[in-house]
Amino acid sequence: MEYDMQKRYVLVVLVLIFFVCSAGCSSSLPAQPTPTPTPTQVVPSTPESRTATVPPSDMALQLSDMNSDYIIKDRSVMISPEVTQLTHDLGWRQGYFVLFYRLNKDKDDQTFIRQSINIFPLENMNKVFSIEKEDMKSGSNGSSTFYEIPFPTIGDMSIAFRGSLTNDPYDFVVYTVLFTKKNVYEKITMTGTTTDYETLKDITQKAAEKIR
């Protein structure tokens, strides 16, 4: 009987030793390393330039921007003698213009669209726009009468007029849009026997989108 009890005691001890060893072996296994997350590369965005980065000729409207019945009558860079002394005083740097023409002899219909593009120092843009706007409102040259009309906002500053030339025997309607974007001042004029306010809005928006 005592032998059986000793045998059982030894068996219990061996079982306990087995579990202790098992636990010790398990705890001694190296822990799996926590994967280090790969840092996300943040690419800083390049701020948009506040001045135009393309030449004036690349900002000019193209035939593809117009209705199919228009042709290019003239286009060229502007030269210094073609701008006023006041324009020079405001820091005028360079300019470009394009003139589109549509003629339908059967209907005695002719229409002109002219775009002029002028580059000034950025700090003078408010002054340039204000002077040109007041000049249109006052009709300082005495040869035209213009009234401001509603027009979608174009670029940074914009305004539109409708009027006529005082001594024009044909009494053509004249639309004029002035707008600035970055360091660019533009003037777009539409006149003739057939003028279209909606077409003017469309091409003016296209002109603004070319300034980048």
Name what the model sees in each region:
Residues 183, 187-212:
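Surface-exposed amphipathic alpha-helical segments
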Residues 1-46, 66, 207:
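Secretory targeting signatures
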Residues 153-157, 179-185:
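Short, solvent-exposed coil/turn segments at beta-strand boundaries
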Residues 144-173:
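Signature of long, low-cysteine stretches enriched in small and polar/charged residues
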Residues 33-107, 141-154, 199, 204, ...:
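N-terminal "mature-domain start" segment
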Residues 110-114, 169-176:
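Short, surface-exposed coil-to-beta transition loops
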Residues 93-131:
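A short acidic-to-branched-hydrophobic micro-motif
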Residues 71, 121-124, 134-137, 205-212:
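Sec-exported extracytoplasmic/periplasmic mature domains
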